């Protein structure tokens, strides 16, 4: 009987062993549950953020979506404290086992499974935890979790075969979700401590490793005391593992929990506006006519041209991975190398802040504070202002959300007038306040806006890009997406057409007011000053002084349709450009990027260079999968380009941009043009040297928000100083290799007229000019 009982036990044991072996064999081969294949094991982290780099190797930021904000780093870039804390806390015999710690597993089965000691600790190794994170779905029940365990054991053994211990630790820390969109140790170190992982202190490393047990429970932002206690548990485990002495533990455990918390998202980093513009640009889909409303046909045409001519536009949907799927900037871990220079980007952002925030904005606030219509012009009636504000309400995200939720118009408008807690932008940092959504709309309209871009005229490489004040609060990108009336900055293109049609800079024109018949109606352009009125003046003088009468005279001698065509050749694709006499005064709306690119032709022998934002793209393994080259087209002949260059240099040396010399003391050869529009609504300045073409626009969110006086509202006051401040910073940095001693490629003694020009024609200082379109 006893012998039979023993045989029975052995039979049961043998059956269990054989069944277990068969089960593990089936799991190993993927017959039971999911078993990753070799390719999957070789690249277990397949979804992580795309990194955007500057031309000088700095990380500008990342593109991510939800839990894909992950930047993978190698083991050698992690603090030794991280490694020791992780091993001591999660798997003390990590370096001794091959994926499964049988001693810890047996202890866990006896204490937790048999004796019911829930606080006895688990038996999972770091490798098993990694297998769970990578391949196990969240279990819906205890039974399902028990079934997942043996699958994770097998995966852990396979991971140990493919990877070294260091690589397993790197995988674990790169994959773990540390909360607050901090996925992976690099993002976590930056989010919680504003540091690189290799620079973490012992206490900081222990705090992050403490999250590995239960991130929500030991969240240091929400539960600092609990997180500190957990950190000290990690430190005590390091003592047990021999990584710390008792004395060191006592000293570190007494330290307070100190965070430098900053949630990381796509709005952070440098060159934010450019990164967001590129993200949408690269992810664009092939334009389909049915996706555009009838009134936006021009945009469909523009996008179609971009799709066919610019390799970067829609790049993700034009290029495909090995599996045939399109690239995704949110999850494919690409490296996008932009042409931005991080130093020049910083100088540009500083220049915009220095002039707009510290100089213009206080003056504008003082001027508008006296108006009941603030920030709008006092020419508007209360009824007109109400219409504008109501339009802003209906365009807001809050309105759209409430409308979709079924609220009535009255309920929505009542909600917009009710004060609530909110955080608003100031130049001194975000401020918590009590304000109604309607008041916040009006508040944000008080801020002057600005856009700035700088590029290399030879290669098209965009070196600096400032799309606005602060992307978190002002997401509209003025440089590429915004279009504003260009005023006098359009005149060099008119003069270029004149040169192409045989005119010379020294040809004479009557400087007087004249009425032209346009489509049977009289048109009489006005000029802001009457200097040399009634005299015959050279075209060069007319451009230097931004004289409206000379521009109108030229327009009367040229074909307006040809003018439209040459604007297109210069890369200006604004849909509201129409052939008319008044087009010579710049009433059309154009983006900063288009204007800056157009002016490259004057510094580049008549060859216009398109902006190039990206030089190359790498995949997540470091392979170059795309490179980009300059895109150029000749718009005017080289001889005429030299004529235009000498005239635009005259704008600086004796015209409306003269303050670059006498106020900002900028040296070297510079060509430029100022621009101001009706009622001082838009201030423009485009300037160029042999090495850089840069342009900026300053104005209100809407045209009725502007300075009252021309002295403050002209382009020479609003926009020119940004260019000047930027260039002074650039010239002061020898590492950039940009110098005022570099000269334009002009023949020695070049004379565009082949005849002497009077000194009066060359030098007559004018600070700025008003542009009128009537």
Give the residues covered by each predicted segment:
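N-terminal type II signal-anchor transmembrane helix
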Residues: 1-53, 93, 113, 359
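Peptidoglycan glycan-strand catalytic modules in the bacterial/periplasmic cell-wall system
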Residues: 46-49, 53-307, 313-316, 322-325, ...
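Active-site SXXK
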Residues: 85-87, 238, 348, 459-460, ...
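Short, well-structured active-site flanking segments
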Residues: 95-105, 183-186, 245-250, 499-519, ...
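Active-site-adjacent helix/loop patches that line small-molecule binding or acyl-intermediate pockets
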Residues: 125-126, 134-136, 141, 145, ...
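Non-catalytic structural connector segments
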Residues: 245-339, 343-407
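Short, glycine/proline-biased beta-turn/loop segments that scaffold the active-site neighborhood
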Residues: 256, 481-536, 610-624
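A penicillin-recognizing enzyme superfamily signal
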Residues: 338, 342-358, 391-456, 461, ...
């Amino acid at each position: 009987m006893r012998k039979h009982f023993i045989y029975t036990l052995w039979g049961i044991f043998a059956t269990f062993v054989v069944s277990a072996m068969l089960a593990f064999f089936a799991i190993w081969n993927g017959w039971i549950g999911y078993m990753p294949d070799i390719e999957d094991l070789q690249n277990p982290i397949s979804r992580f953020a795309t990194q955007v780099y500057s031309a000088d190797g700095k990380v500008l930021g990342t593109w991510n979506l939800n839990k894909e904000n992950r930047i993978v780093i190698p083991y050698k870039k992690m603090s030794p404290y991280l490694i020791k804390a992780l091993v001591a806390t999660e798997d003390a015999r990590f370096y001794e086992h091959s994926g499964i710690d049988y001693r810890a597993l047996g202890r866990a089965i006896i204490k937790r499974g048999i004796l019911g000691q829930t606080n006895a600790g688990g038996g999972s190794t770091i490798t098993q935890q990694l297998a769970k994170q990578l391949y196990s779905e969240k279990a819906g029940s205890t039974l399902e979790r028990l079934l997942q365990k043996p699958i994770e054991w097998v995966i852990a053994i396979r991971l140990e075969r493919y990877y070294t211990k260091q690589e397993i630790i790197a995988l674990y820390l790169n994959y773990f979700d540390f909360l607050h969109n901090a996925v992976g140790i690099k993002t976590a170190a930056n989010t919680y401590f504003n540091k690189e992982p290799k620079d973490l202190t012992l206490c900081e490393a222990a705090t992050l490793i403490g999250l590995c047990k239960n991130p929500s429970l030991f969240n240091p932002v929400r539960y600092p005391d609990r997180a500190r206690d957990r950190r000290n548990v990690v430190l005590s485990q390091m003592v047990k593992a021999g990584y710390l002495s008792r004395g060191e533990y006592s000293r570190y455990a007494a330290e307070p929990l100190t965070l430098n918390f900053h949630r990381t998202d796509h709005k952070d980093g440098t060159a934010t506006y450019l990164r967001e513009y590129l993200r949408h640009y690269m992810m664009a889909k092939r334009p389909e006519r049915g996706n555009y409303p009838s009134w936006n046909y021009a945009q469909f045409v523009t996008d179609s041209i971009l799709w066919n001519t610019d390799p970067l536009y829609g790049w993700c949907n034009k290029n495909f991975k090995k599996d045939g799927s399109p690239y995704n900037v949110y999850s494919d871990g690409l490296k996008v190398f932009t042409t931005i220079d991080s130093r020049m980007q910083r100088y540009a952002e500083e220049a915009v802040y220095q002039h707009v925030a510290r100089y213009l904005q206080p003056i504008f606030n003082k001027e508008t504070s006296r108006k009941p219509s603030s920030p709008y012009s006092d020419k508007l009636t209360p009824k007109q202002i109400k219409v504008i504000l109501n339009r802003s309400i209906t365009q807001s995200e809050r309105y759209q959300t409430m409308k979709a939720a079924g609220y009535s118009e009255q309920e929505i408008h009542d909600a917009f007038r009710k004060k609530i807690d909110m955080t608003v932008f100031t130049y001194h940092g975000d401020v918590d306040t009590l304000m109604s959504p309607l008041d916040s709309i009006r508040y944000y309209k008080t801020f002057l806006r600005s856009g700035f871009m700088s590029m290399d005229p030879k290669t098209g490489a965009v070196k600096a890009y400032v799309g606005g004040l602060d992307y978190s609060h002002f997401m509209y990108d003025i440089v590429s997406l915004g279009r504003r009336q260009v005023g006098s900055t359009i005149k060099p293109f008119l003069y270029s057409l004149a040169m192409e049609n045989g005119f010379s800079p020294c040809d004479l024109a009557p400087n007087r007011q004249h009425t032209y018949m346009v489509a049977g109606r009289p048109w009489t352009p006005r000029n802001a000053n009457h200097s040399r009125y009634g005299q015959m003046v050279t075209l060069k003088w007319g451009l230097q002084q931004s004289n409206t009468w000379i521009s109108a005279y030229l327009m009367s001698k040229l074909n307006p349709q040809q003018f439209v065509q040459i604007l297109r050749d210069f890369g200006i694709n604004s849909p509201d450009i129409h052939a008319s006499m008044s087009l010579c005064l710049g009433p059309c709306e154009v983006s900063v990027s288009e204007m800056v690119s157009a002016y490259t032709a004057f510094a580049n022998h008549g060859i216009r260079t398109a902006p190039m934002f990206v030089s190359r793209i790498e995949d997540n393994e470091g392979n170059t999968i795309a490179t980009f080259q300059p895109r150029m087209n000749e718009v005017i002949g080289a001889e005429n380009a030299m004529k235009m260059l000498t005239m635009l240099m005259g704008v600086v040396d004796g015209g409306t941009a003269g303050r670059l010399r006498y106020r900002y003391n900028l040296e070297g050869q510079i060509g430029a043009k100022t621009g101001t529009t009706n009622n001082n609504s838009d201030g423009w300045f485009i300037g160029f040297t042999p090495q850089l073409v840069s342009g900026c626009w300053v104005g209100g969110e809407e045209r009725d928000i502007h300075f009252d006086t021309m002295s403050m509202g002209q382009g020479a006051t609003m926009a020119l100083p940004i260019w000047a401040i930027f260039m002074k910073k650039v010239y002061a940095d020898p590492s950039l290799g940009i110098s005022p001693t570099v000269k334009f490629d002009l023949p020695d003694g070049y004379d565009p007229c082949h005849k002497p020009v009077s000194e009066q024609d060359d030098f007559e200082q004018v600070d700025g000019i008003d542009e009128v379109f009537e």
